A protein has these predicted regions:
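Short beta-strand-loop
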Residues: 1-13, 98-110
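Generic detector of well-ordered alpha-helical segments enriched in charged/polar residues
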Residues: 12, 71, 101, 105, ...
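Exposed acidic/Ser/Thr-rich ligand/metal-binding surfaces
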Residues: 27-79
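A short, terminal or domain-edge coil/loop segment
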Residues: 33-52, 98-106, 140-156
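Hydrophobic/aromatic beta-strand patches that form the interior of the parallel beta-sheet core
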Residues: 53, 89-91, 117
């Protein structure tokens, strides 16, 4: 049902945040799942492009793996050549603290994300714009299939 029709009281005490984001572990699991799916498609002789969009509201605080481990997984995805192209986008939402933006930008640079977007607020308008950006990015990546090259990065 639409968000405006949800009763916020139904969600009281359901979730408690404690700054325990496992960003690196989550990115690794997502990338590995993408890799496995690409390998399965390649075995069936399908060409595939992939897009991994990582959306976070903060820094990593409790992963068991680090930035270098994420980079290794990204590098392996490219080296294994199961994908014609890979587009990786890191999106920080509601990022108001400069140190958080800096840390996410460092993550983007060290790991090799294709693109990093820092969104300062999580307003309805901003999230709608973000959804449109992701939709266009997926479409662009899909249209690049068979071209031998990556899709064009879009501007948020």
């Amino acid at each position: 049902k639409p968000l405006k029709q949800c009763n916020t009281g139904d969600y009281s005490n359901v979730f408690g945040s404690a700054g325990s984001t496992v960003l690196y572990d989550a990115v690794i699991e997502s990338a590995k799942a993408t890799q496995v799916y690409a390998e399965n498609l390649a075995k069936e002789r399908y060409l595939a492009n992939a897009i991994n969009v990582v959306i976070t509201d903060g820094c990593d605080y409790s992963s068991t793996q680090g930035m270098n481990d994420v980079k290794k997984v990204f590098d392996k995805m490219i080296q294994d050549e199961c994908l014609e192209s890979l587009l990786t986008i890191l999106i920080g939402v509601n990022i108001k603290e400069p140190h958080v933006k800096q840390e996410l930008d460092t993550f983007h640079q060290k790991v090799g994300f294709t693109q990093f977007i820092a969104v300062e607020d999580a307003s309805e308008k901003t999230l709608a714009k973000l959804a449109d950006f992701i939709s266009k990015s997926v479409s662009s990546q899909s249209q690049a299939l068979g071209s031998g090259g990556a899709s064009q990065s879009l501007t948020f």
